[in-house]
From Swiss-Prot:
Function description: Catalyzes the decarboxylation of S-adenosylmethionine to S-adenosylmethioninamine (dcAdoMet), the propylamine donor required for the synthesis of the polyamines spermine and spermidine from the diamine putrescine.
Entries under Pfam families matching the protein: AdoMet_dc (PF02675)
Taxonomic source organism: Desulfitobacterium hafniense (strain DSM 10664 / DCB-2)
Record-given protein name: S-adenosylmethionine decarboxylase proenzyme
Reaction catalysed by this enzyme: S-adenosyl-L-methionine + H(+) = S-adenosyl 3-(methylsulfanyl)propylamine + CO2
Amino acid sequence: MEVKPLKKLRLYGFNNLTKTLSFNMYDICYAKTPEHRDAYIQYIDEEYNAQRLTSIVTEVARIVGANILNIAKQDYDPQGASVTMLIAEEHLGPENPDNDPFSPVYTDKEGPLPDAVVAHLDKSHITVHTYPESHPHGGISTFRADIDVSTCGQISPLKALNFLIESFAPDIIVADYRVRGFTRDVDGKKVFIDHKINSIQNYVDRKYRDLYQMIDVTVFQEYIFHTKMILKDFDLDNYLFGTAKKELSINDKRKIKQRLKKEMAEIFYGKNMPRI
């Protein structure tokens, strides 16, 4: 869905509103043996390494219409990766003295100007961190990725929401969106939000709304929007790593399904739960 601005809103000077989308996604699987668990962690670590994450956040920057100032990326030992990208609404550089917003992206190879880093370090940025984990009890392994897209000015991180869902295809999503600060119209009146929204679901494509069960917690007067999403359909084949469903007995299938559903419910509701 397009981010629609409020009608007839004319601002004075720069748009000082800060808009932040926090996107937390979870992938859950059953890995029967220690070897399977190690293989799952290794697979996730390679699938979502720093280079792959950099490609994802670079596309996020393109989608929201931001220019890249700098990129820092790191793979961690024994597992995990992170990427931090500084972005700006307008291109800043010696070949763009007029701050033309349609000029080419400023790449990490060229590097940002020092004052650009200072100006945008705590406001316009994209970060992603990954957290693979497993536990020997129960055979459950999980992968979490946290993505934060924070912008100031007219660009909106909500534009990247569907791309992030497509990129990770997660089992569970916890999304938070908030707007902070204020800007002013030409008459000096404060503007605390500059676009229409009553739920993050407004910006989720129908094909994903059909796939996920969703619940909202909205504090509109504080410009806080919270949406949780969990896949509606459960196919055990999609959650087995290193083991085929046909290799399991009916009783094993039932037990594994119960463990996985319990794990997913606990993550979705954010609390430990009795046996399902």
